[in-house]
Amino acid sequence: MHSVMSMLYYTLIIAFLIGTQAAPKSEDNGPLEYPAEHSLPSTQQSNGQHIAKAAPQTTHGRFAWMPDGTEDLNIAMDQNFFKKKRFRSSRVLFSTQPPPVSRKGQSTGFLSSAVSLNRTARTKRTAHPVLHRGEFSVCDSVSMWVGDKTTATDIKGKEVTVLGEVNINNNVFKQYFFETKCRDPRPVSSGCRGIDAKHWNSYCTTTHTFVKALTMEGKQAAWRFIRIDTACVCVLSRKSGRP
């Protein structure tokens, strides 16, 4: 009887140790779209402004924000937070004023470092070279900074609310997204420009990619991958009855 109890005792100890080792040990087990727990610091009220206060992080890496009774939720963040490469995207910009846009909607780059938090260069990223004789784009696209995005689809296909503004060093920074989309699905009557309409059906369509952006879900704010428009491409299909 004594030996049976001893074996049962050791069995329970081994089962406990196995269960302990199987438990998550760090924040790395959280979903990819959420930052580490030290990414969003606790906020404080300053200069009489009402700023939301961060609650402890949940097990899924989300950050709960408790409004202080004001209607407008003002999220405060540390400027050094944006220096983390994993949260940086060349298509996402936090700025106190609209980014400059050159003629035909082409971006001329980020604002100066005193105004813009993103240091990734985007100088004329979407500017096309001067077209010589006989050189034309298959599809016409338009690029612009979008600063009024309120909702978006995340990487899981769920609709989320995009965080419009954040408070950094008592300055309100707006979240902008650099998007590219088709100007016209059919730049010519037959579809895409330069395509043999005798053998092919064609049309221009906008394609998407996912970028990390600050979003809100209820009273929780976190980084998530959201879908934005990034290019205009030509879609081809062979006409039926032709080899």
From Swiss-Prot:
<dbReference type="GO" id="GO:0030425">
    <property type="term" value="C:dendrite"/>
</dbReference>
<feature type="signal peptide">
    <location>
        <begin position="1"/>
        <end position="22"/>
    </location>
</feature>
<keyword id="KW-0165">Cleavage on pair of basic residues</keyword>
<dbReference type="InterPro" id="IPR019846">
    <property type="entry name" value="Nerve_growth_factor_CS"/>
</dbReference>
<comment type="function">
    <text>Nerve growth factor is important for the development and maintenance of the sympathetic and sensory nervous systems. Extracellular ligand for the NTRK1 and NGFR receptors, activates cellular signaling cascades through those receptor tyrosine kinase to regulate neuronal proliferation, differentiation and survival.</text>
</comment>
<dbReference type="InterPro" id="IPR020425">
    <property type="entry name" value="Nerve_growth_factor_bsu"/>
</dbReference>
<dbReference type="GO" id="GO:0005615">
    <property type="term" value="C:extracellular space"/>
</dbReference>
<dbReference type="GO" id="GO:0030424">
    <property type="term" value="C:axon"/>
</dbReference>
<comment type="similarity">
    <text>Belongs to the NGF-beta family.</text>
</comment>
<keyword id="KW-0964">Secreted</keyword>
<feature type="region of interest" description="Disordered">
    <location>
        <begin position="26"/>
        <end position="50"/>
    </location>
</feature>
<dbReference type="GO" id="GO:0043524">
    <property type="term" value="P:negative regulation of neuron apoptotic process"/>
</dbReference>
<dbReference type="GO" id="GO:0008021">
    <property type="term" value="C:synaptic vesicle"/>
</dbReference>
<protein>
    <recommendedName>
        <fullName>Beta-nerve growth factor</fullName>
    </recommendedName>
</protein>
<comment type="subunit">
    <text>Homodimer.</text>
</comment>
<feature type="disulfide bond">
    <location>
        <begin position="192"/>
        <end position="234"/>
    </location>
</feature>
<dbReference type="GO" id="GO:0021675">
    <property type="term" value="P:nerve development"/>
</dbReference>
<feature type="disulfide bond">
    <location>
        <begin position="139"/>
        <end position="204"/>
    </location>
</feature>
<dbReference type="GO" id="GO:0007169">
    <property type="term" value="P:cell surface receptor protein tyrosine kinase signaling pathway"/>
</dbReference>
<feature type="compositionally biased region" description="Polar residues">
    <location>
        <begin position="40"/>
        <end position="49"/>
    </location>
</feature>
<dbReference type="GO" id="GO:0005163">
    <property type="term" value="F:nerve growth factor receptor binding"/>
</dbReference>
<dbReference type="GO" id="GO:0008083">
    <property type="term" value="F:growth factor activity"/>
</dbReference>
<dbReference type="InterPro" id="IPR020408">
    <property type="entry name" value="Nerve_growth_factor-like"/>
</dbReference>
<dbReference type="GO" id="GO:0048812">
    <property type="term" value="P:neuron projection morphogenesis"/>
</dbReference>
<feature type="propeptide">
    <location>
        <begin position="23"/>
        <end position="125"/>
    </location>
</feature>
<keyword id="KW-1015">Disulfide bond</keyword>
<dbReference type="GO" id="GO:0038180">
    <property type="term" value="P:nerve growth factor signaling pathway"/>
</dbReference>
<feature type="disulfide bond">
    <location>
        <begin position="182"/>
        <end position="232"/>
    </location>
</feature>
<keyword id="KW-0339">Growth factor</keyword>
<dbReference type="Pfam" id="PF00243">
    <property type="entry name" value="NGF"/>
</dbReference>
<keyword id="KW-0732">Signal</keyword>
<dbReference type="GO" id="GO:0050804">
    <property type="term" value="P:modulation of chemical synaptic transmission"/>
</dbReference>
<dbReference type="InterPro" id="IPR002072">
    <property type="entry name" value="Nerve_growth_factor-rel"/>
</dbReference>
<dbReference type="InterPro" id="IPR029034">
    <property type="entry name" value="Cystine-knot_cytokine"/>
</dbReference>
